Amino acid sequence: MSEEKFDAKVDKVSGSVKESVGKLTGDKEVESEGKVDKLKGHAKEKLADIKDTIKGASESFKKKD
């Protein structure tokens, strides 16, 4: 797993925890921060996937040369 994907997973997990804590304590701010962290994690993960796809395509073209 790449460092970027690991960071994305950390953001998603910490976001889920924050969101749950916010819900349990009734703290809407913490709950919202958790949702933002989860979305940030999803975005990082998608970006890492795109980078991996581009890297794979680039390597395929290099092999053809």
From Swiss-Prot:
Membrane spanning stretches: none
Region Disordered, annotated ranges: 1-29
Domain of life: Bacteria
InterPro entries: CsbD, YjbJ_sf
SUPFAM superfamilies assigned to the protein according to its UniProt record, in alphabetical order: Hypothetical protein YjbJ
Comp. bias (Basic and acidic residues): 1-12
Entry similarity comment: Belongs to the UPF0337 (CsbD) family.
Annotated protein name in UniProt: UPF0337 protein SAG1136
Taxonomic lineage of the native organism: Bacteria, Bacillati, Bacillota, Bacilli, Lactobacillales
